Amino acid sequence: MGYNIGSYDVIVIGAGHAGCEAGLAAARMGSKTLMLTINLDMVAFMPCNPSVGGPAKGIVVREIDALGGEMGRNIDKTHIQMRMLNTGKGPAVRALRAQADKFAYQHELKKTIEETPNLTLFQGMVERLIVEEGVCKGVVTQAGAEYTAKTVVITTGTFLRGEIIMGDLKYSSGPNNQQPSITLSEHLEELGFDLVRFKTGTPPRVNSNTIDYSKTEIQPGDDKPRAFSFETTKFIMDQIPCWLTYTSTETHRLIDENLHRSAMYSGMIKGTGPRYCPSIEDKVVRFNDKPRHQIFLEPEGRNTQEVYVQGLSTSLPEDVQRDMLRTIPGLENVEMMRTGYAIEYDAIVPTQLWPTLETKKIKNLYTAGQINGTSGYEEAAGQGLMAGINAACRSLGKKEVVLGREDAYIGVLIDDLVTKGTNEPYRLLTSRAEYRLLLRHDNADLRLTEVGREIGLIKEERYERFTNKKLQIEQEKERLSSIIIKPRPEVQELIRNIGGSELKDGIRASDLLRRPEMAYEHIHLLVPSEVELSDEVKEQVEIQIKYEGYIEKSLQQVERMKKMESKKIPVDIDYDAISSLASEARQKLKDVRPLSMGQASRISGVNPADISILLVYIEQGKIARVSNQ
């Protein structure tokens, strides 16, 4: 017999990286919010790599921060090392990556949640949803407790019917040997959701005291203070290095000889694994021409000897893992502390979601994170933030928020999921974004702070600092456009010293900055600013001036795309009534139910001819008759 515990505006199921962002966002927006998790000791836990950021992912963390989310602030307080990646490349692919103290990260974020008004954290396993006439009204826990709510967000990670697999050993479990969520997965199927089976994996952890670091290459953090969050003013300078080593021919021989014992190759694993994070078995088989593969040794925290062996994700048996580790330079005498394993879990087919992350099947129910078929903490956190924002908006009677592909990598991520779906764990890459020159690490605050303020997640003090930064950027750009630099001897000398061509006549400072060999600091030496500018302002001025032409082209592409996005498609359109559509296109359109012609054009299997037919059909005004049938 169930018993009612209480009523909330928003209930979040799960307290991983998606759940934490969802719960915090909803509560901070003024919604009475409840977070339910299987184990309070696992809030914000990092079950796999102890890091945040990297290519594309680091930009997502910046976007989360610009919108008012927590991940950036939290990693800034708890990292052991931070590095800017791809500094030798263009600004579109630069990204920050932090090595986390995973235990400090977890403790700090749990503390933030516990201290947040409007937010209640409780240990309990949700087994089913309360659904009435296609509307989600709350949840029921294993203990029989009923919690009613205006909206519910599911962020269950890899817990849904989770199974850990290692060699021929297979048992029901969530990550890190936690209790899995089996009944909720079965309940979602009963409600009519299509589920898929995915797989991911993690490498072994080893004892730092047993590593011979003299045989490895040190990988230090950056000397320059770095941060993900716009709010961070105190920087951690006491950094801990990572270390680089490689597999050997002996490693590969051992793996080849034991492939039949790997769950990946014995048939034990049925789920689809991540393409961009393959197991060491996969790497050895698929890239058998490579004599070695990189292995990074990453400390898991400041107060532990556990080291994460990045690059060695595996489902081989324990004895093979131990032998394999000892074939790697520096690890000849290593002691393994935890085994690597593969984990299979259920995910929903994400084309069953609207761009708000609300499910199409059940109103007021949202999903975010690995349940939507993604991999990675950052992808989960970005979805969790948006799902929490939209669940709160619905509960408060406000308009929901959808980020476009031109607005953010988070927008690219969600649009890919709900429009194209995924047949493998989805990882965000810079190559997935058409407008990546617009979606840079350095301008996330300029793109999204206004959105965060409108939502109610950006405080006034921060907004004032942001507007001051924007003003300084514009004023400095105007200053450089108004100053003429003449070919004086000191000017010519500086230009010669950096390998440039001497001036023949006077030139605007902004035009001189457009030269590939010129940096803002060179211009500043010639025409210094009277106002002291931050490094972030200087960087923004240089990028906006130097890449102005390319940025303008991207903005023109965005405008063309927006014309297609502005052509709306009625939700209840009857695609069967459009006889000239190709059968594959008709089925895909019925499955996805796109909201605009732009979204329809991105569906796999819908070609330009189908789009033209659909466009003509809508413009002829037949929709009303179809809708009224």
From Swiss-Prot:
Q: What is this protein called?
A: tRNA uridine 5-carboxymethylaminomethyl modification enzyme MnmG
The subunit field of the Swiss-Prot or TrEMBL record says: Homodimer. Heterotetramer of two MnmE and two MnmG subunits.
Q: Which cofactors does it use?
A: FAD
What processes in GO biological process is this protein linked to? tRNA methylation; tRNA wobble uridine modification
- Function statement: NAD-binding protein involved in the addition of a carboxymethylaminomethyl (cmnm) group at the wobble position (U34) of certain tRNAs, forming tRNA-cmnm(5)s(2)U34.
Q: Which InterPro entries match?
A: FAD/NAD-bd_sf, GIDA_C_N, MnmG, MnmG-rel, MnmG-rel_CS, MnmG_C, MnmG_C_subdom, MnmG_C_subdom_sf
Entry keyword annotation includes Flavoprotein: yes
Its family?
Belongs to the MnmG family.
Intracellular or extracellular location(s): Cytoplasm
Which amino acids does the record list as binding FAD? Answer: 14-19, 126, 181, 370
A GO molecular function term, named singly, is:
flavin adenine dinucleotide binding
Q: Name one GO cellular component term.
A: cytosol
Q: List the gene name.
A: mnmG
What species was this sequence derived from? Bacillus cereus (strain ATCC 14579 / DSM 31 / CCUG 7414 / JCM 2152 / NBRC 15305 / NCIMB 9373 / NCTC 2599 / NRRL B-3711)
UniProt keyword annotations, A-Z: Cytoplasm, FAD, Flavoprotein, NAD, tRNA processing
The residues forming a coiled coil are none
Main localization category:
cytoplasm
Binding residue positions for NAD(+)? 273-287
